[in-house]
Every structure is written in structure tokens, then in C-alpha cells.
UniProtKB/Swiss-Prot annotation:
Keyword Hydrolase: yes
Subunit structure and binding partners: Homohexamer. Organized in a ring with a central cavity.
Binding site for ATP: G361, A362, P363, G364, V365, G366, K367, T368
Keyword field contains Nucleotide-binding: yes
Main location group: cytoplasm
Compartments where found: Cytoplasm
The protein's name: Lon protease
Enzyme class per UniProt: hydrolase
Role: ATP-dependent serine protease that mediates the selective degradation of mutant and abnormal proteins as well as certain short-lived regulatory proteins. Required for cellular homeostasis and for survival from DNA damage and developmental changes induced by stress. Degrades polypeptides processively to yield small peptide fragments that are 5 to 10 amino acids long. Binds to DNA in a double-stranded, site-specific manner.
Pfam families: AAA, Lon_C, Lon_lid, LON_substr_bdg
One Gene Ontology molecular-function label: ATP-dependent peptidase activity
Domain of life of the source: Bacteria
Gene field: lon
């Protein structure tokens, strides 16, 4: 280098033309070719060539900027010497530069068409190589050697070049220039002025790069191995194919032969057989390892597993069927009678289409287990499908085979599982289905449950008609109103009311306790439940229409007795009403007990609930005011309207009741239904509210021995209501034996067990006047 260059290098500051680079960092001692096309950069290079061929290279912060300003450039760059410059035909320059030293920009000087910068030279002093520096250099060198092993793009001679460098600054910059780094990492290394800081950064970067290269190499090895395996299989398969052709062999492999034999054995309908043969031929021509072959196999397995012609032979014996139903279910006489009727018709007319039964009742009343009993009574297979939470139509109809991961719908899968064409098919929780953007499963069920259509039910996956007409469908639901009307119309609804206390006790003694004792390894000699103890469990530890919680409580007692026996604290236990609390703790529930007192403004109604029903006091207070009606007690809209209708009726009877003409302008009425935290709704408290209002306004007490239910109209007509059995059981449990109910509910009363009828006296009414005569005074007309 000439004397002028030496002089300039000894100076602390320097002024040189600026070359802005995009996405490239030039390190000291690094030789790199650059392609230059921007006018300012070309001017700067030409200026440098006129002088001493030196230039300062700064990287742009954003390489997308075409004409960068000083704030768009990093402040630390590299002083470089232009080694070679070639003008290209398109006007661009190809230059080769060698980095010399780092420099920090102090000021920018704009001259004509390019920038000159005033910069401070940073690599002026050579640091002392102490033990820490040597250790760092050795660590970096070792990691760089490991890096070269994984990065095949670098020649092995590179390591020899680096090993011979003793100067720390040049050592670090040379290694940095050979690494495949991100632009930001390169700039960080360039800006690391301290040699030790630079070496530490370099060490961490190389470690990270080695880990990345290891993962990449592992993935490449795995992919290469898989490709080699696939190529090998393809090559061998083609060889095998060629050998068979040379030997003139047309031998089907075992898999194809197996599918053909199975199709022959099943004696499929002609349309189905054509489809199966077509799929078998397609499988034969498809490479066995291809995804398409797997799809065809799954399809053939599904089609050939279905019971196209397999029908379970029925042995219809009404006496045997009755014994089966009675042995597994206590009560439920209406349901049993309907099943026996179906069996009788089935015996006389075997070709008659099966009905669709819909069992509606509270949880735990035996809907699902009744489905199993029906299958056993008929001697058929049983299959259950829960529809709770289903919201995709494809769950019923299946997915088309064009989709990845397609599969048949749950109806076809269940028939495949049943193994026969005429099972008892229980569709559980049909009221829990919902719909979304994927379709409405309830709409898809319309075809399944329609006897006129289900003989050709087509699943999207099968694309073949399947006959469901011989299936006896039984559906279950807790309530009917969520079920769409078209679907409900296709079913014969049978309501399962809640069990009476007597029925629950019988179920416990006949079914629950023997099963629980067997499950817990106990005998009747080791534990005995008295009937009264079961009554107490039902009344004070459960609140339900069914018997699930009763079974849990009985099981809890049995577990505690088992523990006592194992610990040697007893050999047998007798569970009585007094010992219940020892096993189950304090009572959890308390049913409302009737006060039976004659009270002004208080009438007792009967409420229907999913847990067995209860009695409900309606309270009315009359206070001075302007005729305002206040309703409290968490009442629904229907119940509020019922209260307003009751008040209007009482106002229309003001003369008969002896009320003043303007009482409705002088007094406010407050109607309250206790247990305010419990939501209440429905019209069945109409006559109870009207009775309480009449009592409060006239000052005559309501006879406390009566419980009542019925809807009232503005004209005073008493309309029928639902849940009669449950309501009567609630009144009886509360100690009330005198009931007032609508005349039109006589038919419901006839269905109540005789044992309960004997304990109560029912007054059937069709007008509110009759109710007021009964509860407010006069001769009682007891039926």
C-alpha cells in the first residue's frame, strides 16, 4: 500500500465516499463481489477510483428503500478498498471490495450526486492477547470446526485458514464472514467493537447454528430414508408385475380373493354386488401402499360388514315377553301394554312396518333400560346411539368419500355393530340435538324414522340404499318441546311419569338392592334394608322422578357396611330409619308439609317439577293504594298473565263476593309465591291465585285441607293442566287428601294407581264459582 494510504490509516478520522449496501454486511479482511446499479453508488465508486480506491460501506436498515437518507443507514460500517471494477453493458458496475477497518460515521456531506462521510476509525489498536482471549478463541475455533462438519457448503480448507490467524480481530471477522447468518446477526457482530464481546457473540451464534443444522440434517435423513423405501417398494412391485406377465400368471392376491369370497357368501342384492365388484377391481389395479388403496379397503370392509340380508329370527311369546318386562321393570304399565300390543300385531301380521316409539320422561325413570328389555322380549339384537350434543348432519348421514378421513354415519355404524337387519335401535336423548352451519341432524333423522322412506336410507359414505324398515326404533327424551314438530310427528309418544314412593320402594327391593349387594360382594344376611328406611332415603336424601340417586344412596350405605365388615367391626347390619343418618349424614331435602290451617289470603297449589312435584303456597296481601298489582317470587310471563286473569275474574264477581264498587281503586294487591330463588311458570296455578285473591279481599279464610290445580279464564272456566299424577303424589306426601282439579282431567286421574286413589278425595270442577264455594264456605260437594 502506498505512503498516502499509510498516512491515512494512522489518522483517527477519515473522509471517504459512501456506498450504501442492501442486505449485505462487509467485514474487515473480507473480499466480496458487489453489483452496483444506483446512481449515487456509481458516482461514489467512480470518485473513489479517481482518488485512493477507498470507500465506506454502510448497510441500509430497510433494504426496500431505493434512495436512502442518512437516518436510513446504520452508523457503523466498514472502510473498504476497491480491488476491481467492471462496467456492464446495462450500465451497472460489478466491483470486488476488501474490508479494511470498522468505522463509526460522525457526519454526512452531500456532494453533487453522492454522499461523503466523515468517520472515526475504530480498529486502531491491537488488543493484548491474554488467557481469557486465548480461551475464547479456542472455544470459537472448536465450535467452528463442528459447524463445518454439518455445513457441507464450506470447504474443509477453511478451517486451516482460520487456524493460522493469531490476531483476535481478524480471527473473529474471518469466521463471521464464513458463517451463513441473518443480516441482523451480521450487523450486530460488525457493531461489536470490543473483541471479547465479539468473540462471545460469535460463540453463541455458532452454537445456535449448529443446533439448527443438526435438526435439518435429521429431517433430511428421515425424508431420504422414506424416499429410498418408497422407491425400493415401487421397484420390487414393478419387478413382480413383470415376472407375472412373463410367466403368463393372472393370479389374484389373497386380499382380493378374500373380498370376492366374502361378497359371494353374503348373497348381496344385485345393485350392491355390482358396486362391490367395481370397487374390488379398482383395488386390484391400485398400488397396495397408496392412500387410495386404503380408502377402498375401508369402504369394502364397511359394505361387507353390514347385515344386508341377515335377519334375527323372532320368537314371539306374549307370556314370556310380559315376564321379561315385569322382571326388569316395576310399574310402567302403559309402556308395557303398548309393547305387548305391538308383539300381538307382529305375530298376526309379520310384514307390518314397525312403529317408532318415543319414550318421554324425567332422568332415571328407566327409558334406556326399557329399550334393552324390549330387545330381550323380542329376541332381537340391541344397539344404542346417543344423540346428545350432536350438531352435524354428517354424524347421521356420513361424509362423502371425496373427503380425507371420511367415514359412514353413526346410523350405518350402529347397524354394522348390531350384526342383524332387524335390531331394536335405541336413539337416546333426541331432545338434546342442535344445529349449526354444518346442517341439522334432526332433519337427517326424518328419513331414518319415516317408515315410508327408510327402506332406502342412503348414507353419503356408502352411496348405496340400506333397508332400515325392519328396525324397531325406540327414541328417548326428557321433554318433548325441543324436538322439531316434523320429527315428533313420525313418532308415537309414550310418557313415562315419575315413580310414586311406593313404586320406588318396590324397585329398590326387587332390583336395586339385589344388584348392589352382588356388585359389593355382600349377601342379604349381611345387610338388610327395612321398607321404612327406604321411604326415608327417598323423602329426605333424594329429590327426583326416577331412581338414580336412590341407587347411589343405597350403594353409599352398602360401601360403608362393607368397610365395617372388612375392619371386623360387625358381621351384619340392619338399616333402619334411625340408622340412616349414621351412613348418609343429615337429611339433604325436606318436602313442603301442608299446614292445614284455614288462613286468609293463602291458598295451597300443586306444582309439577322434573324431580317429583311439590305443593306451593300462594300468598296475597291487600294494602291501601291505587289498584296496583305486584307479583313476586321469580314468576315467568305465563304465570304473571295467569295472575292478571285471576284478578280480572275476581273483579267481575265483586257483587257476589260483597266487594265495594271501587275496591280496585282503593287497594293494592301483592301476590307472592314463596321460594323466590326458584323460577316458576305455567298457567296451572290460576285457580289457586284466584282463590287467594278472593280470600284476601273478602277476609274469609281458605280451608287449609285443600290443594288445587287448574287454569282459570276471564269468564271463570277451569281448564285442564298437565302433570296430574306427579301433583297428586306431592299433595299426598304433604299430608293433603282433599284435591281440587279440572273436570277435564278425570281421564288423567283414572291412570293413577288404585292405592293412591284410596287415600285421597278429589273434587272435579269446571268453573271458578265451584272452587270458591268449596274453599270459602258453603256445603262441600265431595266426589
Amino acid at each position: 500500500m502506498d505512503q498516502e494510504m499509510v498516512t491515512k490509516e494512522t489518522e483517527k478520522y477519515i473522509e471517504l465516499p459512501l456506498l450504501a449496501s442492501r442486505g449485505v454486511v462487509v467485514f474487515p479482511h473480507m473480499v466480496i463481489p458487489l453489483l452496483v446499479g444506483r446512481e449515487k453508488s456509481i458516482e461514489a465508486l467512480e470518485k473513489a477510483m479517481v482518488k485512493d480506491k477507498e470507500i465506506i460501506i454502510l448497510s441500509q436498515k430497510d433494504e426496500k428503500i431505493e434512495d436512502p437518507d442518512p437516518e436510513d443507514l446504520y452508523t457503523i460500517g466498514t472502510i473498504a478498498e476497491v480491488k476491481q471494477l467492471v462496467k456492464l453493458p446495462n450500465g451497472m458496475l460489478k466491483v470486488v471490495v476488501e474490508g479494511i477497518k470498522r468505522a463509526r460515521i460522525i457526519d454526512f456531506i452531500e456532494i453533487d450526486e453522492y454522499f461523503e462521510v466523515r468517520a472515526e476509525i475504530l480498529d486502531q489498536t491491537v488488543p493484548e492477547v491474554d488467557l481469557e482471549m486465548k480461551a475464547l478463541m479456542k472455544a470459537v475455533l472448536n465450535k467452528f470446526q463442528e459447524y463445518i462438519k454439518y455445513n457441507r457448503n464450506l470447504p474443509s480448507e477453511t478451517i486451516m485458514t482460520v487456524t493460522n490467524i493469531e490476531e483476535p480481530a481478524r480471527f473473529s471477522d474471518t469466521i463471521a464472514s464464513h458463517l451463513e447468518l441473518k443480516f441482523r446477526q451480521e450487523q450486530d457482530l460488525l457493531e461489536a467493537i470490543s473483541i471479547k464481546e465479539r468473540l462471545n457473540k460469535l460463540l453463541e451464534i455458532i452454537k445456535d447454528e449448529i443446533e439448527i443444522l443438526k435438526v435439518e440434517q435429521k429431517i433430511q435423513k428421515k425424508v431420504r430414508k422414506q424416499v429410498e423405501k418408497t422407491q425400493k417398494e415401487y421397484y420390487l412391485r414393478e419387478q413382480l408385475k413383470a415376472i407375472k406377465e412373463e410367466l403368463d400368471e393372472d393370479e389374484e392376491d389373497d386380499e382380493i380373493e378374500e373380498y370376492r369370497n366374502k361378497a359371494e357368501e353374503l348373497d348381496l342384492p344385485e345393485k350392491i354386488r355390482e358396486k362391490v365388484d367395481k370397487e374390488i377391481e379398482k383395488l386390484k389395479k391400485t398400488p397396495s401402499m397408496s392412500p387410495e388403496a386404503t380408502v377402498i379397503r375401508n369402504y369394502l370392509d364397511c359394505v361387507l360388514d353390514l347385515p344386508w340380508n341377515k335377519v334375527r329370527e323372532e320368537k314371539i311369546d306374549l307370556d314370556e315377553a310380559k315376564n321379561v318386562l315385569d322382571s326388569e321393570h316395576y310399574g310402567l304399565e302403559d309402556v308395557k301394554e303398548r309393547i305387548l300390543e305391538y308383539l300381538a300385531v307382529r305375530k298376526l301380521a309379520p310384514q307390518k312396518k314397525s312403529p317408532i316409539l318415543c319414550l318421554i320422561g324425567a332422568p332415571g325413570v328407566g327409558k334406556t333400560s326399557l329399550g334393552r328389555s324390549i330387545a330381550r322380549a323380542l329376541g332381537r339384537d340391541f344397539v344404542r346411539l346417543s344423540l346428545g350434543g350432536v350438531r352435524d348432519e354428517a354424524e347421521i348421514r356420513g361424509h362423502r368419500r371425496t373427503y380425507i378421513g371420511s367415514r359412514p354415519g353413526r346410523i350405518i355404524n350402529a347397524m354394522r355393530e348390531a350384526g342383524s337387519k332387524n335390531p331394536v335401535f335405541l336413539l337416546d336423548e333426541v331432545d338434546k340435538m342442535s344445529s349449526d352451519f354444518r346442517g341439522d341432524p334432526a332433519a337427517a333423522l326424518l328419513e331414518v324414522l319415516d317408515p315410508e322412506q327408510n327402506n332406502e336410507f342412503t348414507d353419503h359414505y356408502l352411496e348405496l340404499p340400506f333397508d332400515l324398515s325392519k328396525v324397531l326404533f325406540v327414541t328417548t327424551a326428557n321433554v318433548a318441546y325441543p324436538i322439531p314438530a316434523p320429527l315428533l310427528d313420525r313418532m308415537e309418544v309414550i310418557e313415562l311419569p315419575g315413580y310414586t314412593e311406593d313404586e320406588k320402594v318396590e324397585i329398590a327391593l326387587r332390583h336395586l338392592i339385589p344388584r348392589i349387594l352382588n356388585e359389593h360382594g355382600l349377601t342379604e344376611d349381611e345387610i338388610h334394608f327395612s321398607s321404612n328406611s327406604i321411604y326415608r332415603i327417598i323423602r329426605e336424601y333424594t329429590r327426583e322422578a326416577g331412581v338414580r340417586n336412590l341407587e347411589r344412596k343405597l350403594a353409599a350405605i352398602t360401601r360403608k357396611v362393607s368397610k365395617e365388615i372388612v375392619e371386623g367391626r360387625g358381621r351384619q347390619a340392619r338399616v333402619t330409619t334411625q340408622s340412616i343418618e349414621k351412613y348418609l349424614g343429615v337429611p339433604k331435602f325436606k318436602y313442603e308439609k301442608a299446614q292445614k290451617k284455614d288462613r286468609v289470603g293463602v291458598a295451597t297449589g300443586m306444582a309439577y317439577t322434573q324431580t317429583g312435584g311439590d305443593i306451593l303456597d300462594i300468598e296475597v296481601a291487600v294494602v291501601p293504594g291505587k289498584g296496583k298489582l305486584t307479583l313476586t317470587g321469580s314468576l315467568g310471563d305465563v304465570m304473571k298473565e295467569s295472575a292478571r286473569a285471576a284478578l280480572s275474574y275476581i273483579r267481575s264477581k265483586q257483587e257476589e263476593l260483597g266487594l265495594s264498587d271501587n275496591f280496585h281503586e282503593e287497594y293494592d294487591l301483592h301476590v307472592h309465591v314463596p321460594k323466590g330463588a326458584t323460577p316458576k311458570d305455567g298457567p296451572s296455578a290460576g285457580i289457586t291465585i284466584a282463590s287467594a285473591i278472593a280470600s284476601a279481599l273478602t277476609g274469609q279464610p281458605v280451608k287449609g285441607k285443600y290443594a288445587m290445580t287448574g287454569e282459570v279464564t276471564l269468564r271463570g272456566r277451569v281448564l285442564p293442566v298437565g302433570g296430574i299424577k306427579t301433583k297428586i303424589m306431592a299433595a299426598r306426601r304433604a299430608g293433603l287428601k282433599d284435591i281440587i282439579m279440572p273436570e277435564e282431567n278425570k281421564k288423567d286421574f283414572e291412570e293413577i294407581p288404585v292405592k293412591i286413589k284410596k287415600d285421597i278425595r278429589v273434587n272435579f270442577v269446571n268453573h271458578m264459582d265451584q272452587v270458591l264455594d268449596l274453599i270459602l264456605g258453603g256445603d262441600e260437594d265431595e266426589n
